[in-house]
Amino acid sequence: MRLWLRGLACQALRSSWGVCRIHTQPPPPPIPEVVATWEAISLGRQPVPEYFNFAHDVLDVWSQLEKTGHRPPNPAFWWVNGSGTEVKWTFEELGKQSRKAANVLEGVCGLQPGDRMMLVLPRLPDWWLISVACMRTGVVMIPGVSQLTAKDLKYRLQAARAKSIVTSDALAPQVDAISADCPSLQTKLLVSDTSRPGWINFRELLRAASPEHNCVRTRSGDSVAIYFTSGTTGAPKMVEHSQSSYGLGFVASGRRWMALTESDIFWNTTDTGWVKAAWTLFSAWSNGACIFVHELPRVDAKTILNTLCRFPITTLCCVPTLFRLLVQEDLTRYKFQCLRHCLTGGEALNPDVRDKWKSQTGLELHEGYGQSETVVICGNSRNSTIKSGSMGKASPPYDVQIVDEEGNVLPPGKEGNIAVRIKPTRPFCFFNCYLDNPEKTAASEQGDFYITGDRAHMDEDGYFWFLGRNDDVINSSSYRIGPVEVESALAEHPAVLESAVVSSPDPIRGEVVKAFIVLSPAYASHDPEALTRELQEHVKTVTAPYKYPRKVAFISELPKTVSGKILRSKLRNQEWGR
């Protein structure tokens, strides 16, 4: 079912890419039919289509619109590495290359619809190609960050029963170390210009593959992606999204919160392993915008600012941690000729950061809030009035409320749980379930609502004000870190008798991991500073390095309940002065 082409191909899009549109407003482009479809679904006037595939029903349609002159000539994808190398694809070229990639997945890899492929790559063009190839073949992609250790990879490959993994040279040794323990793993695909024993070289196969491929017919409810999200009481859980929850669900955020059009060039600095990368892919391409990517082997403020000056980027999205770094620079030295819209999310934004950014650039920071389980739940859209410190208003089609512990809706001004109404009608832009964890899926629902686990209050004007989390998950620089994962890593060191991990305030990262440790008797007399460094390095080798405790305190005993459960909340409140 092609959602856009009908009725649009005969309309001419007058706007074209040339100079940046800063002081003038172009004529509004014709609204793509997918937007009308989304609005009809959200209003209950039209059901979610039985069949939907983002690659076929969206990307291939934009390719046709390019051919008929109904889209500006800016690329669909633009990648740079900071050393002079650039990759640009139109939607037509993206279609050609992704069909070749689809043939690689179906051919040599032998993958079929419903099979799962783990995708762990840095910011390389191959990540976007393989993501689209997964959609074309019905293969379910499982993105992961490049900092995963062998232990992390083993757990994810086993839990997801992944049949294939795609990664780069840097992570291949870790995969080799655990692949024998992953019985479902059949093929290992290497994105590299060199070969490695036991691996299939993706780039070699891509060059030789046929550009002809028939996209599989997928149902709207078929799985498109699985994300592992950190929890507080055990191993990361699997969040499953469908073709329609992402493929149709991000039309709204793309047009409203991100304010993207066919003429925009959108840069989100996120890592490919985080859900924000998928948000960008679906939001930008559903609206015909260009996705800009900088390889960013090392993320630093000057690289970001210089890139904004050098390239015609119109829309920028960074986590608050990065904006905290950017405002420490003298922003008056940088001239952003094309930048018109700035977005942030993933953690609370300090009002002073927003004020500093606006005072030096003239641009607002538009905060948004969502989860791995959802799309954008609420946000400050481009033309809305911003209340500094607020996450903005509910994003359609969500009915967002503040509820008490029994699921009763609270009046404005009352603190409670952020909740999304899922009954009598579950929003189509919502995760399917926590895979293989029906208990967790059931526990996330209360009455008519899905409970986010975050607390806030809503004011009389419908703006939401974030207060904190119900759970113990640590949100450091937008990296969600489960305390159990860090505590388990610490427990593998002989110096640690027991530990409790909580968040601790940090002026740059918002919050960081702090470990309270009770030492084994044999280590009680060791030098605290040296032991701290040793434990930090130990955690980095056992789990993803971003999880290591930046702060360590050695104490004689941990606070516990009468039943022996560690009271992380008491330690956390102590850190935050509550």
From Swiss-Prot:
Enzyme class: ligase
Keywords assigned by UniProt, alphabetized: Acetylation, ATP-binding, Fatty acid metabolism, Ligase, Lipid metabolism, Magnesium, Metal-binding, Mitochondrion, Nucleotide-binding, Transit peptide
Top-level taxon in the UniProt lineage: Eukaryota
Localization: Mitochondrion matrix
Organism from which the protein derives: Mus musculus (Mouse)
Transit peptide: 1-22
Protein name: Acyl-coenzyme A synthetase ACSM5, mitochondrial
Cofactors, names only: Mg(2+); Mn(2+)
Gene Ontology biological process: fatty acid metabolic process
Residues annotated with N6-acetyllysine modification: 96, 151, 302, 335
Role, per record: Catalyzes the activation of fatty acids by CoA to produce an acyl-CoA, the first step in fatty acid metabolism.
GO MF entry, a single one: metal ion binding
Catalyzed chemical reaction(s): a medium-chain fatty acid + ATP + CoA = a medium-chain fatty acyl-CoA + AMP + diphosphate
